[in-house]
Swiss-Prot record:
Species per Swiss-Prot/TrEMBL record: Synechococcus sp. (strain WH7803)
Keywords: Methylation, Ribonucleoprotein, Ribosomal protein, RNA-binding, rRNA-binding
Biological process according to GO: translation
Organism taxonomic ancestry: Bacteria, Bacillati, Cyanobacteriota, Cyanophyceae, Synechococcales
Entry protein name: Large ribosomal subunit protein uL11
Quaternary structure and interacting proteins, as annotated: Part of the ribosomal stalk of the 50S ribosomal subunit. Interacts with L10 and the large rRNA to form the base of the stalk. L10 forms an elongated spine to which L12 dimers bind in a sequential fashion forming a multimeric L10(L12)X complex.
Record note on modification: One or more lysine residues are methylated.
Family classification: Belongs to the universal ribosomal protein uL11 family.
Gene Ontology MF term list: large ribosomal subunit rRNA binding; structural constituent of ribosome
Alphabetized Pfam families for the sequence: Ribosomal_L11 (PF00298), Ribosomal_L11_N (PF03946)
Length: 141
């Protein structure tokens, strides 16, 4: 019989920089998970993606063992890196803070496709384009 999942924890951590300090320690500690084992495994899996925030979904089982799935970086992080800006606009309707080319948009959509709720690259591009528009980032051809 399969082990029973007692909790699912979702965190967004810097790639390769997980440590027992908050938010990791308290989130895992309350479920009795070995925090250092998680940190070492997470850092090993994400060391090649340094500089990105990588969301992780941790499944904790009855016997306090765990498994985790790393996701792709948030679209907003990928857009800010592509546009070369620090952060998105607070008032996106009034003006743009940067721009990205349609080819960059397609690359971001291809990266995010496994985590998005769509099957075609065109629909993924529309989702990412909407995120960019809300951040005040213009799309150029």
């Amino acid at each position: 019989m399969a082990k029973k999942v007692t909790a699912v924890i979702k965190l967004a951590l810097q790639a390769g920089k997980a440590n027992p300090a908050p938010p990791v320690g308290p989130a895992l500690g309350q479920h009795g998970v070995n925090i250092m084992a998680f940190c070492k495994e997470y850092n090993a899996r994400t060391q090649d993606k340094a500089g990105f925030v990588i969301p992780v979904e941790i499944s904790v089982f009855e016997d306090r063992s765990f498994t985790f799935i790393t996701k792709t970086p948030p679209a907003s992080v990928l857009i800010t890196k592509a546009a070369g800006i620090e952060k998105g606009s607070g008032e996106s309707a009034k003006g743009s803070v940067g721009s990205i080319k349609r080819s960059q948009l397609e690359e971001i959509a291809k990266t995010k496709l496994p985590d998005l709720n769509c099957t075609s690259i065109e629909s993924a591009m529309r989702i990412i384009e909407g995120t960019a528009r809300n951040m005040g980032v213009a799309i150029t051809d």
